[in-house]
Curated annotation (Swiss-Prot):
One of its GO terms (biological process) is 'de novo' IMP biosynthetic process. This is Bifunctional purine biosynthesis protein PurH. It comes from Corynebacterium glutamicum (strain ATCC 13032 / DSM 20300 / JCM 1318 / BCRC 11384 / CCUG 27702 / LMG 3730 / NBRC 12168 / NCIMB 10025 / NRRL B-2784 / 534). PROSITE patterns: MGS. InterPro entries: AICAR_Tfase_dup_dom_sf, Cytidine_deaminase-like, MGS-like_dom, MGS-like_dom_sf, PurH-like. Its EC number is 2.1.2.3, 3.5.4.10. Pfam families: AICARFT_IMPCHas (PF01808), MGS (PF02142). The gene is purH.
Length: 520
């Protein structure tokens, strides 16, 4: 691709976001570039004492319909779309008395921001830009002749290009690609919003008839789950882990991100101060504490200190200096929190490789998706919000009602077991997990694993949670033999009566929630 620089002699500017406009206009004026502009943009440039041609003067047609029609005119679009490499195009421009543009600077109405503000339907519709995307797409298509700029972040590039004889062909192509991404993102945002409005009015489904997402490459990662797999991080429009601020440590890996996401979600499932330690997307330990976040960390780590080695730690509260000192004694891949007490980052940074992240709370609403071959599965996020997640709605199926203290442990266990890959059994005591059985293909093995991880002493007197019903009594019997005092489970098995009978026989209290928390 040749250099083929196009000197900028004429520019069209129409921007909602006026950031950097003053410097841009002054730079163009210094190089004697003719400026054509619209509405408030033209007024702003004129206020600077810079000559500017209002677009209505160019077209001979007034702005109308409350500004809905400004630039939709042949004298504008012919000047943008003329391919100046073609003699026929140049001849037609001369006949039509239209001068070509070499630079188009446009940014669009703030549709996404208007929607986010909670504006009503009509107000959002008014912020759907028509003329702006038309000019951007036209200029991007004609990038062999025109440079298109859609972000104030590119204004310095414009100023540099003015000094070097214009943008090169390669630079114009890059700007065109950015412009098409810009309008595509805008259109996806509008289409998604409109589809969601229709879905909200449709009593048959809460899901939109069309889903579109846009994500931008943030950076390439060293590799994927395994060294032979290439990988990259793309970021979306919502804030979250992908936009986390990193204070220290090596670059995040693919596996670091997946484990951090699991840990972050697990910690924020709990309203009380909570620490979750995750390895391979499963909990090594989770604990809550009203005493301190450091206490929560101690108890979470104590659940399985062997597996916690090289794990990911997430806290839903500020990391204190006390907690930082504890973490600094343990090999940890990542620690993530909403904030850090003064001095905590410095303590953690004494460990060369630990990745220290600060992130906003995870999204606690909406839908999540998963790719399958040929399609996409979409579901409502599991936010521990089912009717059966409220202990007030639990059914006492066996034994006697437990004390408030034991009930708190059952509530904690029920919330924590959501973070465990199915089949999941979790043992808890005093607001902390003491044994976790995860990812087994039958519930008996998960129960055995949880008991084995806890050990006889910690299992005795603990409570248990099962993410789904016991299909037979054998899984429950493993827990009863280990000395648990109470268990919470969804119920719903055709053999519920056998399981409940086993609980009564063992003297174990059993609550049924009617809600399930599979995690695959």
């Amino acid at each position: 691709m040749s250099d083929d620089r196009k000197a900028i002699k004429r520019a069209l500017i129409s921007v909602y976001d006026k950031t950097g406009l003053e410097d841009l206009a002054q730079a163009l004026h210094r190089e004697n570039v003719e400026i054509v502009s619209t509405g408030s943009t033209a007024a702003k440039i004129a206020e600077l004492g810079i000559p500017v041609t209002p677009v209505e003067e160019l077209t001979g047609f007034p702005e109308c319909l409350e500004g809905r029609v400004k630039t939709l005119h042949p004298k504008v679009h012919a000047g943008i779309l003329a391919d100046t490499r073609k003699e026929d195009h140049l001849r037609q421009l001369k006949e039509l008395e239209v001068a070509p543009f070499q630079l188009v600077v446009v940014n669009l109405y703030p549709f996404a921001e208007t929607v986010a503000s909670g504006a009503d339907f009509d107000a959002c519709v008014e912020q759907i830009d028509i003329g702006g995307p038309s000019m951007v797409r036209a200029a991007a298509k004609n990038h062999p002749s025109v440079a298109v700029v859609v972000s104030p972040n590119r204004y310095e590039d414009v100023q540099e290009a003015l000094k070097t004889g214009g943008f090169s062909r390669a630079e114009r192509t890059k700007l065109a690609a950015e412009a098409f991404r810009h309008t595509a993102t805008y259109d996806v945002t509008v289409a998604t919003w409109m589809s969601e409005q229709l879905a909200a009015e449709d009593s048959e489904t809460e899901f939109p008839g069309w889903i579109g997402t846009t994500n931008t490459l943030s950076r390439s990662l060293r590799y994927g789950e395994n060294p032979h797999q290439s990988a990259a991080l793309y970021v979306g429009n919502t804030r979250g882990l992908a936009q986390a601020k990193q204070f220290h440590g090596k670059e995040m890996s693919y596996n670091n991100y997946t484990d951090s996401d699991a840990a972050w979600r697990a910690a924020w499932d709990h309203e009380r101060p909570c620490v979750a330690i995750i390895k391979h997307a499963n909990p090594c330990g989770i604990a809550v504490s009203d005493e301190s976040i450091a206490a929560a960390h101690r108890e979470a780590h104590a659940c399985d200190s062997v597996s916690a080695f090289g794990g990911v730690i997430a806290s839903n509260r500020e990391v204190s200096v006390e907690m930082a000192n504890q973490v600094a004694e343990i090999f940890t891949e990542v620690i993530i929190a909403p904030s850090y007490e003064e001095g905590a980052v410095e303590i953690l940074s004494q460990k060369k490789n630990i990745r220290i992240l600060q992130a906003e709370a995870p999204v606690r609403k909406g839908f999540e998706s998963r790719e399958i071959s040929g399609g996409l599965l979409v579901q409502e996020r599991d936010l521990i919000h089912a009717e059966g997640d409220n202990s007030a709605n639990w059914t006492l199926a066996a034994g006697s009602a437990v004390s408030p203290e034991v009930l708190k442990d059952l509530e904690f266990a029920w919330t924590a077991v959501r973070s465990v890959k199915s089949n999941a059994i979790l043992l808890a005591k005093n607001g902390a997990t003491v044994g976790v059985g995860m990812g087994q293909v039958n519930r008996v093995d998960s129960a055995r694993l949880a008991v084995d991880r806890a050990g006889a002493e910690r299992a005795t007197g603990s409570v248990a949670a099962s993410d789904a019903f016991f299909p037979f009594a054998d899984g429950f019997e493993v827990l009863a033999e280990a000395g648990i005092t109470a268990v919470v489970q969804p119920g719903g098995s055709i053999r519920d009566n056998e399981v409940i009978e086993a609980a009564n026989k063992a003297g174990v209290t059993m609550y049924l929630t009617g809600a399930r928390h599979f995690a695959h």
